[in-house]
């Protein structure tokens, strides 16, 4: 009797790593695969993954950036300890394939899998490869990337996104008969973005009754953002800390003003929604490069944070009537790789058969 194939997913830290991993896990679960997760106990995967019916094991590992000299000297011992922890879990569960989706956990987990003779599939979500994935790419059986350029000559498969997002109606259907104020969705990620929380209330005041706004302010920023809107405008608006049903929010929106993390960019493309991106400023310009493809194909605009002003953003939005926004939405959907979960799953299955 053949036992079910087994996949160990290594992902942690942020939704940009965890949610694509969950999308692939769900796809393979539907095909009878057993899934287990490797993460850290103090990050979001510890709560989120079990809610999806997936068992999770934890190793102790943290990033090295910004650490003091004493901690840096102790780091090699901690990394070896984390590798040994991961190898113990791998030996006990015996996965057929290990999938690394990024985060600190992927480093020790990937090395442990390689030492155990288990094939490692890497998936890089961003247009600039993270340090962990750069190292692991040397020992991985297969390296995949969401956007071209993270690795030279590696397969571009897109970012796996949630099925409720890929299942949304087409932009043409959603925009048909839509009237009234332009619907602006503001998203700064689960932690919010202070610059957007400060700027959008002023933008609302400048645009007046031309717009209505749904604003995700992020944890701990609800009250101050709501007060900023009350001070600036009487434009219809809704401010929430989080948006639980992001697919419904995308379906509602005419345009999204947001950061350009890898998952956000991929979800907007899959949903078919135009965007104005305000990338997080980072020395490697990771978020700006994530957004570049949608900007180039006419699905999005980009304003660097240093150039962002309420007046400038209001002027940009004022030029985007609903017909233009529909064209941007159509371009976004046409640029999407909506079967990224299938593509990653197919690679995993091919390695499991060897």
Swiss-Prot record:
One GO biological process term: cell division
Main location: membrane
Enzyme Commission (EC) number: 2.4.1.227
Membrane topology: Peripheral membrane protein
Cited Pfam families: Glyco_tran_28_C, Glyco_transf_28
A GO CC term assigned to this protein in UniProt: plasma membrane
Main EC class the enzyme belongs to: transferase
Gene3D superfamilies: Glycogen Phosphorylase B
Superkingdom, taxonomy of origin: Bacteria
PANTHER family assigned: GLYCOSYLTRANSFERASE, UDP-N-ACETYLGLUCOSAMINE--N-ACETYLMURAMYL-(PENTAPEPTIDE) PYROPHOSPHORYL-UNDECAPRENOL N-ACETYLGLUCOSAMINE TRANSFERASE 1
Family: Belongs to the glycosyltransferase 28 family. MurG subfamily.
Role: Cell wall formation. Catalyzes the transfer of a GlcNAc subunit on undecaprenyl-pyrophosphoryl-MurNAc-pentapeptide (lipid intermediate I) to form undecaprenyl-pyrophosphoryl-MurNAc-(pentapeptide)GlcNAc (lipid intermediate II).
Protein name: UDP-N-acetylglucosamine--N-acetylmuramyl-(pentapeptide) pyrophosphoryl-undecaprenol N-acetylglucosamine transferase
Organism: Photobacterium profundum (strain SS9)
């Amino acid at each position: 009797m053949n036992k079910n194939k087994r996949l160990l997913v290594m992902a942690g830290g942020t939704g940009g790593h965890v949610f694509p991993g969950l999308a692939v896990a769900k796809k393979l679960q539907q095909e009878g695969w057993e899934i287990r997760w490797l993460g850290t106990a103090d990050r979001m995967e510890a709560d989120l993954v079990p809610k999806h019916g997936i068992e999770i094991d934890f190793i102790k590992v943290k990033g090295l950036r910004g650490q003091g000299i004493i901690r840096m000297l102790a780091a090699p011992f901690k990394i070896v300890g984390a590798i040994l922890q991961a190898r113990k879990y791998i030996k006990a569960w015996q996965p057929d394939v290990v999938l690394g989706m990024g985060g600190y956990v992927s480093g020790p987990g990937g090395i442990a899998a390689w030492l155990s003779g288990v094939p490692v599939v890497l998936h890089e979500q961003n247009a600039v490869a993270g340090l962990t994935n750069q190292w692991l790419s040397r020992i991985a059986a297969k390296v995949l990337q969401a956007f071209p350029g993270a690795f030279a000559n590696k397969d571009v498969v897109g970012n796996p996104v949630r099925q409720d997002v890929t299942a949304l109606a087409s932009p043409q259907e959603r925009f048909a008969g839509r009237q009234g104020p332009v619907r602006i969705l503001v998203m700064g990620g689960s932690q919010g973005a202070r610059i957007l929380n400060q700027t959008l209330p002023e933008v609302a005041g400048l645009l007046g009754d031309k717009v209505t706004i749904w604003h995700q302010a992020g944890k701990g920023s609800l009250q101050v953002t709501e007060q900023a809107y009350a001070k600036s405008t009487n434009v219809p608006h809704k401010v929430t800390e989080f948006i639980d049903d992001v697919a419904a929010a995308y379906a509602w929106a005419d345009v999204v003003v947001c950061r350009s993390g890898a998952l956000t960019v991929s979800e907007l493309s899959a949903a078919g929604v135009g965007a104005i991106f305000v990338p997080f400023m980072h020395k490697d310009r990771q978020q700006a490069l994530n957004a570049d493809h949608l900007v180039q194909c006419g699905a999005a605009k980009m304003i660097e944070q240093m150039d962002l002003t309420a007046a400038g953003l209001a002027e940009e939005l004022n030029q985007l009537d609903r017909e233009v926004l529909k064209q941007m939405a159509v371009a976004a959907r046409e640029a999407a790789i909506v079967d990224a979960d299938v593509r990653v799953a197919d690679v995993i299955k091919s390695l499991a058969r060897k």
